[in-house]
Amino acid sequence: MHRTGTFIIVDGLTGSGKSTVLNAVHDWALTCGHKRFRLQDWKESKPPRFEDIPDFDVYFTFEPTRNWVGDAIRSELSRVDDPYGGEELAHAFSLDRQMQYKRLILPALQAGKTVIQDRGVSSSLV
């Protein structure tokens, strides 16, 4: 049986209240008794695969990640000399996004789970 999950992206400008909304949704999921996975709490260097953490009801993710490609992006974005142009950063974000979707988000949705993400592709388009 094919199950389809729910995918919600919370996006907006810096300071627009994304974290406030996400924290409220997380607290709501907690009071409802849902098992929650927060990518920000993942401590391993490799990004998680769904098959390693399948027992959660709600997955809270974000972009860019803090593993592999996402960690490199964050490191490079913090450089003062900023040697990268917008197109190069878009490619880097795209690779990070693709890895997260293939490893975690799409399998979770196919298993009928809920994924709530802080930022998404719309952040890259602005």
Task: State each model region's role.
Residues 15:
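Walker A (P-loop) phosphate-binding loop of P-loop NTPases
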Residues 18:
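Conserved lysine of the Walker
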